[in-house]
């Protein structure tokens, strides 16, 4: 393939689109982990897609920017100005939490970093539609009191980046 050819919706051939979901008000440790994760993903050439807001989203975009990478924020409201200052591309959707569907569908694989119910909804949707998920200090799932081994869980951002990039590489769309 030449440099300008497109493959499906992933953009230039071989460029993974990695979604990052996470808490808007995380504890400081998660902020540090998310920033390192963003840096690692950008260093690997991934486009990082997130909700574009505060907390984990700001931290991951800060890491992406520090490494000279590309981040895309799918904002819940109607204003580009509501995005965090590290976003490469701010896309206002006007969809509120409905943007979670866009985040999952735009991603070849997803990393969940900490998070609340919004992150849980993104994990569930990704699993439902077959988008690979990697967890980093996030939700664990149970069904009828039994653990569900639905996705791998990383111990640190380097492992999370490796796992999600491996998963994204296996996706054919």
Residue ranges and their predicted role:
Residues 11, 32, 39, 54-129, ...:
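Acidic/glycine-enriched connector segments
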Residues 12-28, 39, 43-44:
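Generic N-terminal amphipathic, Lys/Arg-enriched alpha-helix
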Residues 45-48, 149-150:
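Short active-site oxyanion
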Residues 49-53:
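Active-site nucleophile and cofactor-binding loops and adjacent substrate-binding regions
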Residues 90-94, 136, 149-163:
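Short acidic-hydrophobic, aromatic-tinged amphipathic segments that line or gate anion-handling sites
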Residues 107-110, 154-173:
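A charged, well-structured terminal subsegment
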Residues 143-146:
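Short acidic/histidine- and often glycine-rich active-site loop of Leloir-type glycosyltransferases
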